[in-house]
Amino acid sequence: MSCYENLVMKTQMNYSRHYSTYASGGTAVVLSKQKPLPYEEQIQEFVRRVQEAECIIVGGASGLSAAGGGDFYYSDTPSFREHFGKFADKYGFKGAFSGMMHRFSTRNEHWGYVATFLNTTQNAPIREPYLDLDRILQGKDFHILTTNQDTQFVKIYPEEKVSEIQGDHRFFQCSQCCQDETWDAVQPVADMIAAMGEGTMVPDELIPRCPHCGAEMFSWVRGYGNFLQGKKYEEEYEKISKYIQKNKDRKILLIELGVGRMTPMFIQEPFWELTNSLKDAYYISVNSEYQFLPEFIEDKGIAILGDIGTVLKDLRKAKEESAFV
């Protein structure tokens, strides 16, 4: 097991023990009682830390995509209506995830919805917060860790710089995990969308099936069933683990963006542990709802409460202005 996966396993056990605390929007970790710096000073400190860092690890979660308009997962937003309107009108869905959990009466309509869901993320443009983040990271040695499955990061960076530890909407797996393989999902999704047209169902012959056992395919993502934790899964963890091992003695900046209360064990709490254990590590989080800075790293981090898109834009501008000072 790689070092980062081991950290995740450790924090998952903590999450299970204190589930009710996390489910109510809290954390089981004792938080700092220090008063946060004013926003403008936080941005200046952020800029300074980026400039001084010898390497950076960015942990990008759902709040990052939501800040750029990818906010259709949990609620009935304009973007949800834009992409899923025909299903919302027919079934009364109030967010994309509610449709993914729905038991459709036919597999044809189930796959019509899945294809719509995957097509929405596969073909989404690179969202503005990601572009601002890219400008902030220019000239730096960095690695991306993400729980997002929406392919935003791999539209900007080469695969070797991104660890997608929760899966990727570009791939299918066998729903029965009969083989340790993943297959392309982009072309099958495009074919289903074309065949579906204005309707909500795809024809039988386009329902994706495993070439080995004949079972239906399944999106290679955690959250809906038998997530294949095989070779590709381990490769994603190996990338981030090797980066940490290679840079553990350098001045490393850990940036956490948009972690919610459902998945603190994949980015947030491992970042806290790394900040504490690595001598020259520093931690910065940005979140629109939670301002969590553990007491045990209160002198090695800051937590910024604010819209992630706004913070990244302000940070980019401040970084660019500082280059001319």
Model-based region annotation:
Residues 2-325:
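Conserved catalytic alpha/beta core of Sir2/sirtuin-type deacylases, generalized to analogous enzyme cores
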